[in-house]
Structures are given as C-alpha cells and as structure tokens.
Swiss-Prot record:
<dbReference type="GO" id="GO:0051287">
    <property type="term" value="F:NAD binding"/>
</dbReference>
<feature type="site" description="Important for catalysis">
    <location>
        <position position="141"/>
    </location>
</feature>
<keyword id="KW-0560">Oxidoreductase</keyword>
<dbReference type="InterPro" id="IPR019818">
    <property type="entry name" value="IsoCit/isopropylmalate_DH_CS"/>
</dbReference>
<dbReference type="GO" id="GO:0000287">
    <property type="term" value="F:magnesium ion binding"/>
</dbReference>
<dbReference type="Pfam" id="PF00180">
    <property type="entry name" value="Iso_dh"/>
</dbReference>
<feature type="site" description="Important for catalysis">
    <location>
        <position position="191"/>
    </location>
</feature>
<keyword id="KW-0520">NAD</keyword>
<feature type="binding site">
    <location>
        <position position="106"/>
    </location>
    <ligand>
        <name>substrate</name>
    </ligand>
</feature>
<feature type="binding site">
    <location>
        <position position="247"/>
    </location>
    <ligand>
        <name>Mg(2+)</name>
    </ligand>
</feature>
<feature type="binding site">
    <location>
        <position position="251"/>
    </location>
    <ligand>
        <name>Mg(2+)</name>
    </ligand>
</feature>
<dbReference type="InterPro" id="IPR004429">
    <property type="entry name" value="Isopropylmalate_DH"/>
</dbReference>
<dbReference type="InterPro" id="IPR024084">
    <property type="entry name" value="IsoPropMal-DH-like_dom"/>
</dbReference>
<comment type="pathway">
    <text>Amino-acid biosynthesis; L-leucine biosynthesis; L-leucine from 3-methyl-2-oxobutanoate: step 3/4.</text>
</comment>
<dbReference type="GO" id="GO:0005829">
    <property type="term" value="C:cytosol"/>
</dbReference>
<keyword id="KW-0479">Metal-binding</keyword>
<dbReference type="GO" id="GO:0009098">
    <property type="term" value="P:L-leucine biosynthetic process"/>
</dbReference>
C-alpha cells in the first residue's frame, strides 16, 4: 500500500512528537511492506512567523493532496498579544473548516500499568474505556457574529452559538455508528434546561436513535456529565456533544489516564483527508528539551491507520507496542515518579523496537492472521 501523509508539526513540542509518530509509521511501513510518503506544511505560530498567516494556502493544498493529515500542536505565549486573526489557534480552526472535519473522536482508555499516575483511585478507573464524539465545525467557536462592540460609551461583546439541524444530525449519527461496534450505549450531553440549541439537539438525537434499535440512548446535562466523568467514569461508552462542551469534557477526561500526553484524537470528514493529532497542547515550557511524551501522537498515528487507511492490524500493533513499553516500566517525564524517565527520542525507540520484535507482537499477528 502507498499512501500520502501530510505532516503539520506546528509549534512547541509538536515538532518533537510528530517526528516520533512519523518514525513509528515508518517502522510499520517496513514491518508490513507499506509505503508512506510524507509531505510537510506550516500551521499556527510557525506559519505566522514564516508566512504571515496561521494557515498558508500552501498548507491547505498540501493537506488536500494527501490521504491523511498528522498534526502536532499549535500556540504559545509568543503570539498571545497578536490580533485575533493572527493567533495560532486560528490556523487549527481554519483547517477544520477547510477539510470539513466535523467529527472529533477522543478515546479514553485505562492502562493498568499507569494506575498510579491517575489522580483517581484504581477502583474508580480500572476498566475505563469510552470515547468522546465531539462536533467540531459549528457552535460558539464558528458562529457569527463574534466581536467586541461599543454601544454608547460601553464596551459589549457577543459570541454566537449556531448550528444547522443537519450538522447536529451527522455528528449524532457518527456517535451511533461508533456505538454499534462497542457496548451499544450513547450518552448525549447538552444544556437543554437553558439553551434552545440543546433542545433541538435532544430532538435530533431521539430521531436518529430510531434507526439504531440496538443502541441505548440517554440524555445528560453537561454539568452532570462533568461530575460523572470523575465520580463514575466507567459508566460511559460513547459520549456525543457539541463543540465547546466536547472541548472541555475531553480535556477533563484526559486526566483519568494520568497525563494529556496519553490521549490521541481523530478529526474525521465524510470526503477527503481526515486529521489526527494528540489532545495535548504545544507545552512551550518543555519544548526542545526532549521531555515531551510522544505517545498521544503515536496513538494518533494508529488512529490514522485505522480510520483513513483501513489498516486495523497495523493500528493494533502500535497500540500493543505502547502497552508493552508501559508495562515494562518505561515512562516519560509527565508520567514518571522521580527523576528516572525516558526522553522523547528514547520512548519512540522503545516503541519501534517492539514493533520490530516478532515475539512482542505475536498475539496481535495471530489474532489478525
């Protein structure tokens, strides 16, 4: 198989973790005789510095000509005082719109070997395995108008929460399609006691549920969902919600694993290249120090293989390799208890070594033979 992957390292640790993810994809290519061609583009602060815009046209074209996109991270204090249209995050929002990346999937998985890294007791998180399906191209982040105004001598501000019914339907349908292959339960999260958009959200969820009689649907207010994620995270299977709620809840859920550095994500489109990125930010405080955890980016590469290329076995091998190195006690700085930890590069080397080891991945190879 020959596929093109557009790589957008971005800012901060993004350059380091995408380098690790590319190394793992190359190891998979060698192991399974696939050819992955990598092209690179600018986004975020790096693009502002070099091209004067957070998302150059050349980057858009690079992405559209690829079969999938691998992103690092964007942002940093260097650009915090820039005008709104020259903020690094605008590049991320723009690429989502350009590629119509409407569905963001964020799996949250418990690793037994990382139980001590979680702020919750093991009995609360053991067995946690759920996925947040977040709508990604509507809501407050994209609604217009979004501006400051002067009315008389007073400054006012306005943001707009805007959704089309079709946008709500397609993300909820994505959640049900995901649940069919899991434990067949969808928790739809909203604020229907206050927001009209959430009341429409509930109506659409009920309509879509009729097409999936084997999948259970429940509604939950976002404040209750935020509480349940900590109180009883094993309760959830598939959580579907609008853009801002999903942004907040998925970051909250990330701490169940002990570190943002463990959580991958996929941003899917119905037609064209989908985008894969770690949930964590650019972490400028550790950028360039070989301290970043590359696992979220590497697991994002596994999601890329699964969702964009249909390479389920290869994705499972990456996930097994990650689990193996964690079980062996290898940790990056964010997960380590003390001063003994692997640098970014050594963690990548440990994972690629497992991929190349026949005995280490024999169970996966047998399962898919």
């Amino acid at each position: 198989m020959t596929k093109k992957v557009a790589v957008l390292p971005g800012d901060g640790v993004g350059t380091e973790v995408t380098k690790g993810a590319v190394a793992v994809l190359k190891a998979i290519g060698e192991r399974f005789d696939h050819q992955f061609e990598f092209t690179y583009g600018l986004i975020g602060g790096a693009a502002i510095d070099e091209a004067g815009t957070p998302l150059p046209e050349s980057t858009i074209e690079t992405c559209k000509q690829a079969d999938a996109v691998l992103l690092g991270s964007v942002g940093g204090p260097k650009w915090d005082r820039n005008p709104s249209h020259l903020r690094p995050e605008k590049g991320l929002l723009a690429i989502r719109k350009e590629l119509d990346l409407y569905a963001n999937l964020r799996p949250v998985t418990f690793y037994d070997s990382l139980a001590d890294a979680s702020p919750l007791k093991k009995e609360y998180i053991e067995g946690v395995d759920f996925i947040i399906v977040r709508e990604l191209t509507g809501g407050l982040y994209f609604g217009k108008p979004s501006e400051r105004r002067t009315e008389g001598n007073k400054e006012t501000v306005v943001d707009t929460l805007f959704y089309k019914r079709t946008e709500i339907e397609r993300i909820i349908r994505q959640a049900f399609d995901t649940a069919v292959n899991r434990r067949k339960k969808v928790t739809s999260v909203d604020k229907a006691n206050v927001l009209e958009s959430s009341r429409v959200w509930r109506e659409v969820a009920e309509e879509v549920a009729k097409d999936y009689p084997d999948v259970e649907l429940e509604h939950m207010l976002v404040d209750s969902a935020a509480m349940q994620l900590i109180r009883n995270p094993k309760y959830f299977d598939v959580v579907v919600t609008e853009n801002m709620f999903g942004d907040i809840l998925s970051d909250e859920a990330s701490m169940l694993t002990g570190s943002l550095g463990m959580l991958p994500s996929a941003s899917l489109t119905a037609d064209g290249p989908s985008l894969y990125e770690p949930v964590h930010g650019s972490a400028p405080d550790i950028a360039g120090q070989n301290k970043a955890n590359p696992i979220a980016a590497i697991l994002s590469a596994a999601m890329l293989l699964r969702h964009s290329f249909g390479l389920e076995k290869e994705a499972a091998v990456i996930e097994q390799a990650v689990e193996s190195v964690l079980h062996a006690g290898h940790r990056t700085a964010d997960l380590a208890d003390g001063n003994h930890y692997l640098g970014t590069d050594k963690m990548v080397e440990a994972i690629t070594a497992v991929i190349a080891n026949d005995s280490a991945i024999s169970s996966i190879m047998t399962a898919y033979s």
